[in-house]
């Protein structure tokens, strides 16, 4: 994090690290720590002291909570990294290459433009769905196309409406347990249903 020099970094560990949901991290650069408070506070809120002590008191004990998801992170990093002969670098290369192949396979069918260059893809890719004049749903509702893909074909893939663009997007995620054949199946279904 020091090399990155970011003021703040946060991320979920459940997707790529295969840890339980709720296992996330928050990094706050030391010069920013006085600016950040937890949503719910505990006894640490009234304690005076240096910021390194205070931030731990405020964030670490915010009520009754099971710390198991966080405690899984180190072992998960080690275990998942061991699934490739090339460690995490090999896993990320695999995910990136599969995500690009998945996107390209789908774009061949949809004939919609690439949304970004390959260099911006790591493990996720998004494709623009054809402008099919389907009314956009609220962010709180499941998109009807998402529901159709899931119920009729057992495909779980997010479909998002973006009202600002008046368009919908389909997003894929690629990991070690995915195969190109799954994305080819998705492309066949898209060709049939769109």
Protein language model regions, located:
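Active-site PLP attachment segment
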Residues: 4-49
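Short Gly/Pro-enriched turn/cap motifs at secondary-structure boundaries
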Residues: 14-17, 62, 116-117
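Short acidic/glycine-enriched loop/turn segments that link adjacent beta-strands
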Residues: 20, 121, 165-168
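Helix-coil boundary/capping segments in enzymes
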Residues: 45, 53, 77-78, 126-131, ...
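Structural motif of enzymes handling amino- and sulfur-group chemistry
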Residues: 48-106, 123
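Conserved PLP-binding catalytic core of the aspartate aminotransferase-like
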Residues: 92-100, 107-152
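PLP-dependent enzyme catalytic core of the Aspartate aminotransferase-like
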Residues: 138-140, 147, 151-152, 156-194
């Amino acid at each position: 994090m020091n090399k990155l020099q970011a003021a703040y970094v946060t991320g979920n560990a459940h997707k790529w690290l295969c840890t339980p949901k709720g296992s996330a991290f928050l990094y706050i650069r030391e010069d920013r720590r006085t600016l950040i408070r937890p949503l719910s506070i505990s006894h640490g809120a009234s304690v005076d002291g240096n910021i390194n002590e205070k931030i731990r008191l405020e964030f670490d004990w915010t009520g009754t909570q099971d710390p198991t998801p966080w405690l899984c992170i180190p072992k998960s990093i080690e275990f998942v990294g061991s699934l490739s002969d090339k460690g995490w670098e090999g896993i990320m290369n695999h995910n990136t290459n599969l995500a690009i192949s998945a996107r390209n396979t789908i774009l061949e069918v949809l004939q919609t433009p690439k949304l970004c260059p390959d260099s911006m893809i790591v493990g996720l890719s998004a494709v623009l769905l054809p402008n099919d004049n389907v009314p956009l749903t609220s962010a709180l509702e499941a998109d009807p196309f998402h529901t159709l893909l899931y119920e009729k074909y057992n495909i779980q893939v997010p479909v998002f409406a973006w009202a600002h663009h008046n368009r919908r997007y389909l997003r894929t995620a690629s990991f070690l347990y995915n195969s190109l054949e799954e994305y080819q199946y998705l492309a066949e279904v898209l060709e049939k249903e769109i």
